[in-house]
Amino acid sequence: EVTTLVWAVSALCIISTLNGFEYKVPDNIKKILFSGEAMPVKHLNIWRKYLPDVMYVNIYGPTEITCNCTYYIVDREFQPGDVLPMGKAFPNEKVFLLDEEDKLITERNKNGELCVAGSALALGYYKNREQTAKAFVQNPLNDRYLEPMYRTGDLAYYNELGELCFATRKDFQIKHMGHRIELGEIEAAMDKVPEIV
């Protein structure tokens, strides 16, 4: 009897896409924790429709910080196109946003690179000093002592409620005719279309 699921978002989406709940709705699940990519609200809402009393927890974290550094307990309804918050840092982690000049971002609705530090941070990439030197760097906000941090390459922002939210990947930016375009914004717009699952 399974009471807790810790699954990749893609696994949860397979169940909702293939109408798995029409076949069977699990009886004993109390908690569902998911990570690996941004959870499409459309799919989360399908799960919540069939399992409304379950605690849903969005977990974020790259492998370089031992996979988990933030969590968000879903505490309200979300509409398609809304962004599910990433939540707050685990007690032994630091999670913060830096702008292109390595200045701390605290204001709302401004994208910055998500950076992480803490006791679970990896030491670098095995036999890859060049990549390690690019991604694992001294925290520019700390000039007092050695504090390595990891540049995730993820862009995030604080929403109107002050919650940390994933925007897109830094390497998903393209320039077209001098304009910076976030491919993640196109993906988010498509998520609002009910016919696209």
Please give the residue ranges for each predicted region.
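AMP-dependent adenylate-forming
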Residues: M55-N58, I73-V197
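Adenylate-forming
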Residues: E1-P85, N92-K94, D99-L104
